[in-house]
């Protein structure tokens, strides 16, 4: 599908650590989370989802939850960078 092909475009962006794609359906918003290094499965599990360490999915139901997911991902990324300074 189109949303999956967009993930592959995002993966080609060098220096990006986490990619998040929101796909809106009638009653829900599906979230695709991908990462090169930062584990994203714990983010997905907080939002009705799961998957693999670096490729996960979740479901949110409104813009407030979308914003909360983005804030959660930002915090995860900040923590990852501070715990792994040699990578940056």
Where are these regions (language model features)?
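Gly/His-enriched, cation/cofactor- and phosphate-binding structural elements
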Residues: 1-88
């Amino acid at each position: 599908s189109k949303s999956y092909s967009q993930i592959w475009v995002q993966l080609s962006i060098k220096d990006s650590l986490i990619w998040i794609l929101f796909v809106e359906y009638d009653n829900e918003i599906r979230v695709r989370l991908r990462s090169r290094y930062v584990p994203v499965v714990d983010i997905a599990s907080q939002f009705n989802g799961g998957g693999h360490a670096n490729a996960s999915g979740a479901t949110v139901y409104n813009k407030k939850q979308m914003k909360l997911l983005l804030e959660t991902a930002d915090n995860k990324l900040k923590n990852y960078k501070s715990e792994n300074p040699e990578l940056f």
